[in-house]
């Protein structure tokens, strides 16, 4: 899967319309673009009627091939506003190989001032759009946009969704034949269900025949303007079953839309927000006196993307999660709660320099690029021992501010000093107990308490481990304020938040003591020397008494494969019995439904990447719970699934 982003190459004609150089075609007809969209995509699919018939708390899903300028999305959103119940939701999924850059997108949408209520929210969030799945949330969660950035035959096969309406809007088949292939139409069929409808401009004969072969009943209908005819259709083919029952979707929860989230750190607060935005009443149980008291409580965390040039599952998740987090941060106060000051990873030795060279070749310049030492120093504002890799969209975040912001939704109730010791399943409800005291109950529970989720029997076998880390808080000086970007080597140092820099962080695999130690403060100061002797001097490190330094220690929680553990939980004993045959033949796929623990989910194991992976994982949990399109490629969601460890034990006999 390609990791390089190619933006649309746009020329503008004398009437202000964008013209694609890649496809030598216009994005929409002059003076008729919106009317064409309304006729072909909204009218032929009877979208207004569909929206009006959406029941409260249900979600209509539109799939599109070719996002382009977003016109179809904006028009569909406007129609949804006009006709849908206020508690219904819209999820729009669109594939785009060559996304417009921000400036081109702003110029294109300025042609439709009547759609400003819909175009402006997108422009505000149109940041960090990189290859893979990129999710946007609008209208307090009522509308979700998932852009699949890349080649359609790389992206759509990874989509896990059930589409109600298709907009086929790639450039004309003669200009863009890759968007009109039997392989693509097979993917449309895979993602459709009886009742799925389709609209498209093209009436090309071989396109119609290929769609019919894929399972769509197609017909020509009157067109608009210079387009005499267009096509519409409906899916009448078979519905494929899931291939791997252990990763199949559990039944969508019925009954009251109430959930418990245990833990109010990044994983818990973002999961609660994702559910609340979907109309759930969420109770968050936190054992401390306030949210973000453990690993999510550091004064500054770094938005650092540890990527792979090989497109691994972790790398794909980081790229998608980074974009989602950056869009969430737009709602916080810049400078106090976060700052997009960039992150500079120093090439501190030959091995690191080689790794960075591969990354610079694999990813686009807007995401990361190599800097020589002089260039790096000019950006950082302090002298450095080497150049490195610069991530211009990175920066630092005050994690407690993000947690607090996520928990402010009116559908969330936070209860502190609630230490859940035991879960009990009673009928269709889960009960949270502290000794002989019932704290709360709900049909859905999400365990988001880092490694402490293992105190609950359904998570007891999850291989989570705790790694102690300590940060050091250094008082800023007049000269240390010259630091303008986060700089990383083996450790990291951030520009000041208020009057303090954050320096860290140690790794201790053995200690269970969370009292900050002088030795680790000294270790962090040594890391600072490796980052910048100049900055250490500006901070007066030589005169600092390590015994008087302030800091903070917490446990990171990580898994053996460094991917988080996110998704529905199964009964471990019943799982082992149901799929015991895998121990003899791993190629077997038993026709046995997974023994889910109905309504029970986990979101844990984010390690030092929680700022990037936890918010999108909250969306992943909510998608599992509500039966919505997953916000990550299916293979990535499976790589994060809690069942992966039980499968490995069965197959490897461990």
UniProtKB/Swiss-Prot annotation:
SUPFAM superfamilies: FAD/NAD(P)-binding domain, S-adenosyl-L-methionine-dependent methyltransferases. InterPro entries: FAD-dep_OxRdtase, FAD/NAD-bd_sf, MnmC-like_methylTransf, SAM-dependent_MTases_sf, tRNA_MAMT_biosynth_bifunc_MnmC, tRNA_MNMC2, tRNA_S-uridine_synth_MnmC_C. Its cofactor is FAD. Its main location: cytoplasm. Its EC number is 2.1.1.61, 1.5.-.-. GO terms for cellular component: cytoplasm. Residues 1-236 are annotated as: tRNA (mnm(5)s(2)U34)-methyltransferase. Signal peptide: none annotated. Catalyzes the last two steps in the biosynthesis of 5-methylaminomethyl-2-thiouridine (mnm(5)s(2)U) at the wobble position (U34) in tRNA. Catalyzes the FAD-dependent demodification of cmnm(5)s(2)U34 to nm(5)s(2)U34, followed by the transfer of a methyl group from S-adenosyl-L-methionine to nm(5)s(2)U34, to form mnm(5)s(2)U34. This is tRNA 5-methylaminomethyl-2-thiouridine biosynthesis bifunctional protein MnmC. The gene is mnmC.
């Amino acid at each position: 899967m390609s990791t390089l982003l190619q933006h649309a190459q746009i020329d503008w004609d004398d009437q202000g319309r964008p013209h694609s150089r890649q496809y030598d075609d216009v994005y929409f007809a002059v003076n008729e673009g919106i009317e064409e969209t309304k006729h072909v995509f909204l009218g032929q699919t009877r979208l207004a009627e569909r929206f009006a018939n959406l029941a409260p708390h249900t979600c209509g899903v539109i799939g599109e091939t070719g996002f382009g300028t977003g016109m179809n999305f904006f028009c569909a959103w406007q129609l949804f506003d006009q006709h849908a119940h206020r508690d219904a939701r819209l999820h729009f999924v669109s594939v785009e190989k060559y996304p417009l850059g921000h400036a081109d997108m702003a110029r294109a949408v300025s042609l439709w001032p009547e759609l400003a209520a819909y175009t402006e929210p997108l422009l505000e969030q149109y940041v960090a759009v990189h290859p893979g799945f990129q999710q946007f949330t609008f209208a307090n969660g009522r509308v979700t946009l998932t852009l699949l950035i890349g080649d359609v035959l790389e992206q759509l096969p990874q989509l896990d969704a059930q589409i109600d309406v298709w907009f086929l809007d790639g450039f004309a088949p003669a200009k863009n034949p890759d968007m009109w292939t039997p392989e693509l139409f097979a993917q449309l069929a895979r993602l459709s269900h009886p009742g799925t409808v389709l609209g498209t401009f093209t009436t090309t004969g071989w396109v119609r025949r290929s769609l019919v072969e894929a399972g769509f009943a197609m017909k020509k209908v009157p067109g608009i303007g210079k387009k005499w005819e267009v096509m519409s259709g409906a899916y009448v083919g078979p519905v494929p079953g899931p291939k791997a029952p252990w990763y199949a979707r559990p039944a969508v929860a019925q009954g009251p839309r109430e959930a418990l989230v245990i833990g109010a750190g990044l994983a818990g607060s973002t999961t609660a927000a994702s559910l609340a935005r979907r109309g759930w009443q969420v109770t968050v149980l936190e054992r401390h006196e306030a949210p973000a008291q453990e690993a999510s409580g550091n004064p500054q965390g770094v938005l650092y993307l540890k990527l792979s040039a090989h497109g691994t599952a972790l790398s794909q998740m980081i790229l998608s999660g980074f974009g989602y987090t950056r869009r969430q941060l737009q709602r916080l106060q810049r400078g106090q709660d976060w700052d997009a000051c960039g992150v500079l990873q120093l090439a501190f030795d030959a091995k690191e320099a080689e790794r960075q060279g591969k990354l610079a070749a694999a990813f686009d310049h807007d995401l990361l690029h190599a800097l020589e030492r002089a260039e790096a120093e000019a950006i950082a504002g302090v002298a450095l021992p080497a150049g490195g890799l610069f991530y211009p969209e990175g920066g630092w975040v005050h994690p407690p501010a993000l947690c607090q912001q996520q928990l402010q939704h009116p559908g969330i109730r936070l209860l502190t000093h609630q230490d859940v010791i035991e879960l009990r399943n009673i009928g269709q409800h889960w009960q949270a107990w502290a000794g002989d005291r019932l704290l709360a109950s709900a049909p859905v529970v999400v365990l988001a308490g880092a490694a402490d989720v293992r105190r609950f029997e359904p998570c007891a076998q999850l291989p989570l481990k705790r790694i102690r880390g300590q940060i050091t808080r250094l008082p800023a000086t007049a000269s240390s304020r010259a630091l303008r970007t986060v700089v990383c080597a083996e450790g990291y140092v951030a520009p000041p938040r208020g009057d303090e820099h954050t320096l860290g962080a140690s790794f201790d695999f053995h200690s269970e003591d969370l009292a900050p130690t002088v030795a680790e403060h000294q270790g962090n100061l040594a890391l600072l020397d490796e980052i910048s002797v100049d900055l250490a001097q500006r901070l007066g490190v030589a005169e600092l008494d390590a015994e008087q330094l302030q800091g903070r220690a917490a446990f990171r929680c990580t898994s053996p494969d460094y991917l988080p553990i996110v998704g529905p939980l199964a009964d471990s004993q019943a799982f082992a019995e149901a799929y015991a045959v895998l121990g003899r033949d791993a190629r077997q796929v038993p026709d046995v439904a997974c023994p889910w623990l109905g309504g029970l989910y986990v979101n844990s194991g984010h390690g030092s990447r929680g700022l990037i992976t936890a918010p999108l994982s909250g969306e992943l949990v909510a998608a599992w719970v509500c039966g919505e399109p997953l916000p990550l490629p299916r293979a990535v969601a499976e790589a994060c699934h809690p069942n992966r460890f039980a499968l490995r034990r069965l197959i490897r006999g461990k």
